[in-house]
Amino acid sequence: MVSESHHEALAAPPVTTVATVLPSNATEPASPGEGKEDAFSKLKEKFMNELHKIPLPPWALIAIAIVAVLLVLTCCFCICKKCLFKKKNKKKGKEKGGKNAINMKDVKDLGKTMKDQDDDAETGLTDGEEKEEPKEEEKLGKLQYSLDYDFQNNQLLVGIIQAAELPALDMGGTSDPYVKVFLLPDKKKKFETKVHRKTLNPVFNEQFTFKVPYSELGGKTLVMAVYDFDRFSKHDIIGEFKVPMNTVDFGHVTEEWRDLQSAEKEEQEKLGDICFSLRYVPTAGKLTVVILEAKNLKKMDVGGLSDPYVKIHLMQNGKRLKKKKTTIKKNTLNPYYNESFSFEVPFEQIQKVQVVVTVLDYDKIGKNDAIGKVFVGYNSTGAELRHWSDMLANPRRPIAQWHTLQVEEEVDAMLAVKK
């Protein structure tokens, strides 16, 4: 029996048995959520272990954490702001697109516009002229003045009262205004107000008198020009206006405001400018004149240049007391001299003398022609009077100033009148 069963067992085919062998420590497969939590906890434990190894106090770690949080918040804020800015740009683009989009109404109005342009062409108007019309003129301020006539003495009385809203021509945002008053067409007698420093609303309250017969007054024009004073360069004109005398009713006193207008270009030929200094020592009775330089002199020679030199006359009551002159500078319109001349003038006489400065062009063959002339001292006006007054107010100190040369005949006429 045993042998038979043994033979059957050997003859039968082997039975394959599949057995699943699990490791001893294996558990059931975990869900995805539980796996993530385990991974996070492991990372946390690892991070905390590394953190404990850093040799820093707790407060430092807290500060680092706060800074990190602030950096993250700042980055988020910047990103949000950039996104909002892009949205706004898109909206603007849409609005522009809407404005630029062709409207059927605009197309219908196109014919009318073309018709209007044709009408303008017939009337001679151009687009440039149409654009210039709405432009406002530059505001130069205004001036209040008064006019009256003294029939008994044949005198025109001009009052310069005040100015307002003048433009600022100086660096500090102000101006140093004064007013010139003269009659056209002669322009021989000019008056100037005092300079008011650093103001755009000066109050003058000055009156000037012109000796003019009433029969001749109708053919004259009164000019009032406001200037900005500058010691070391040419004075800038702010604005002016003209009053034809034949339009004024002299039956009563005229007092009114007038807006200043842009000044017309000077028709008179420019003769140039000269710079000289004045110094007076009262105790010694010594007046020193230093001729420094001249510029932009009138061309007197054929070659377009000049040979300028300067004469200085000390005068009193129309008489020449002393005469000096500089060296001649050849072939130049901008000569530099820096030559000093002294005059003895007692203190009691300094208010009565005049210093007349004349620039001449030297000529070997003919007469030396005068280029221009200016005088300071007794009865001088404007910039010349201010220069003289500054010298007297600052004894022993040289005071330099530029002066505009005037026509010789006009200066001689002023010297003759003001004896």
From Swiss-Prot:
It is found in: Cytoplasmic vesicle, Secretory vesicle membrane; Cytoplasmic vesicle, Secretory vesicle, Synaptic vesicle membrane; Cytoplasmic vesicle, Secretory vesicle, Chromaffin granule membrane; Cytoplasm. It comes from the Eukaryota. PROSITE patterns: C2 (PS50004). Residues 133-379 are annotated as: Phospholipid binding. It is a single-pass membrane protein. One of its GO terms (cellular component) is axon. Disulfide bonds: none annotated. The keyword ATP-binding does not apply. Keywords: Calcium, Cytoplasm, Cytoplasmic vesicle, Differentiation, Glycoprotein, Lipoprotein, Membrane, Metal-binding, Palmitate, Phosphoprotein, Repeat, Synapse, Transmembrane, Transmembrane helix. The modification Phosphoserine is found at S262, S340, S342. A lipid is attached at C75, C76, C78, C80, C83 (S-palmitoyl cysteine). Glycosylated. Gene3D superfamilies: C2 domain. The modification Phosphothreonine is found at T126. Homotetramer. Heterodimer; heterodimerizes with SYT2 in presence of calcium. Interacts with SCAMP5. Interacts with STON2. Forms a complex with SV2B, syntaxin 1 and SNAP25. Interacts with SV2A, SV2B and SV2C. Interacts with RIMS1. Interacts with PRRT2. Interacts with DNAJC5 in a phosphorylation-dependent manner. Interacts (via N-terminus) with RAB3A. Interacts with SYT12. Interacts with calmodulin. Interacts with DNM1 (via C-terminal proline-rich domain (PRD)); this interaction facilitates vesicle fission during clathrin-mediated endocytosis (CME). Calcium sensor that participates in triggering neurotransmitter release at the synapse. May have a regulatory role in the membrane interactions during trafficking of synaptic vesicles at the active zone of the synapse. It binds acidic phospholipids with a specificity that requires the presence of both an acidic head group and a diacyl backbone. A Ca(2+)-dependent interaction between synaptotagmin and putative receptors for activated protein kinase C has also been reported. It can bind to at least three additional proteins in a Ca(2+)-independent manner; these are neurexins, syntaxin and AP2. The first C2 domain mediates Ca(2+)-dependent phospholipid binding. The second C2 domain mediates interaction with SV2A and probably with STN2. This is Synaptotagmin-1. It comes from Macaca fascicularis.
